[in-house]
């Protein structure tokens, strides 16, 4: 996939606000502060397209970005830690699960995991959820450049055991761009269906 055109499209807080067109959606999911927005900015080459923050839980809406005028990249709120109350976390959880279960135009879920803390309980729960609803998913290990060689080997083994049904596992560094072309190449088979 070559990205030549990128634009913010819409933010929604309820399923009723989702776009009605039938463009394929590549969905980016992961824990709060795992680097979803940073990854989107890196992939598109547009700094600031997706708002980033050091504070977990800044993304509170489902954000749609129109790519090449015929594909959506969808930035979901993070799961896990966020500086919000239990009631708001429950609303987010219901919104995200309903979206993933009901949205027919989802072509692929890209699950981002912090390579320094792979397969935490919340990540394993998300993997199980995606598999139980037959959603194709791939794994992106973020912050991969911060690992030692030994940690890289250990992380690879952990991921092979807990995400055996993942369509791909890509080691990604937004800093160096490592993994970008590999990840974009994987997207082609999910948007050309």
Curated annotation (Swiss-Prot):
Sequence ranges assigned to domain EngB-type G in this UniProt record: 22-193
Function as written in the Swiss-Prot or TrEMBL entry: Necessary for normal cell division and for the maintenance of normal septation.
Protein name: Probable GTP-binding protein EngB
GO molecular function: GTP binding; metal ion binding
Chain positions recorded as Mg(2+) binding sites: 37, 59
GO biological process terms held by the UniProt record: division septum assembly
Residues that coordinate or bind GTP: 30-37, 57-61, 75-78, 142-145, 172-174
Keywords: Cell cycle, Cell division, GTP-binding, Magnesium, Metal-binding, Nucleotide-binding, Septation
Organism per entry: Pelodictyon phaeoclathratiforme (strain DSM 5477 / BU-1)
Family: Belongs to the TRAFAC class TrmE-Era-EngA-EngB-Septin-like GTPase superfamily. EngB GTPase family.
